[in-house]
A protein has these predicted regions:
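Transmembrane alpha-helical segments of major facilitator superfamily
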Residues: 2-11, 67, 102, 140
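Multi-pass alpha-helical transporter architecture, strongest
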Residues: 45-55, 135-167
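A late C-terminal transmembrane helix in Major Facilitator Superfamily
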Residues: 11, 15, 85-123
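Hydrophobic transmembrane alpha-helices of Major Facilitator Superfamily
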Residues: 12, 57, 69-77, 104, ...
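Transmembrane alpha-helices of Major Facilitator/SLC transporters
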Residues: 1-25, 40, 108
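Membrane-interface helix caps of multi-pass small-molecule transporters
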Residues: 16, 20, 24-25, 53, ...
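C-terminal transmembrane helical hairpin of 12-TM major facilitator-type secondary transporters
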Residues: 30-78
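A membrane-interface helix-boundary motif in multi-pass transporters
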Residues: 32-35, 116-141
Length: 167
């Protein structure tokens, strides 16, 4: 119950924070719309790992405060950049594709991978197998964060090209 409240309330706060920060920083340099998401993901990763590997539920909840707040940080800036880069008549389809991929991996393949790793790790590590499996999944989040940083480097050029194509 506590974790669900943390995710719900923290996710809402984080989503709003991301929108505000991304808009503010993006006015100075549009690349910050992507860089912000990448940096926040990298900063949150160690907190996630510590939470997943914690010995007690209370300690895990404390470590997971930051990751629950920034867990949905990517959503607003990502949709904004997606809508900026595609033609107006393609925004609905682009959003649908992004949400489809997000759900396939986030709600389908990701949990399946965690379960399979947990099953494989439990004979050796006991009840810690699930925590280790979750901690290993942080690597995928870091990989995504690095790609936000890389994507940010060419974002201004990509936006200019998209706007030129729209004319």
């Amino acid at each position: 119950t506590i974790l669900a409240l943390m995710i719900g309330i923290g996710g809402g706060v984080g989503t709003m924070m991301a929108g505000i920060l991304s808009d503010r920083m993006g006015k100075k340099d549009v690349r910050w719309n992507m860089w912000l998401v990448g940096i926040v993901g990298i900063v949150a990763a160690p907190f996630s790992v510590m939470g997943y590997l914690s010995a007690t539920g209370q300690t895990a909840l404390l470590w997971l405060v930051i990751p629950t707040i920034v867990g949905a940080f990517y959503f607003g800036p990502t949709l904004a950049m997606l809508h900026t880069l595609v033609k107006p008549e393609m925004r609905s389809l682009a959003s649908a594709i992004m949400l489809f991929i997000n759900n396939i991996f986030g709600l389908g393949i990701g949990p399946l991978m965690v379960g399979m790793m947990s099953d494989a790790l439990t004979p050796r590590y006991g009840v810690q197998g699930l925590g280790i499996a979750l901690a290993l999944m942080v690597i995928i989040g870091l990989w995504g964060s690095v790609h936000y940083l890389i994507g940010g480097r060419s974002l201004a050029r990509d936006i200019a090209a998209a706007q030129a194509q729209a004319r």
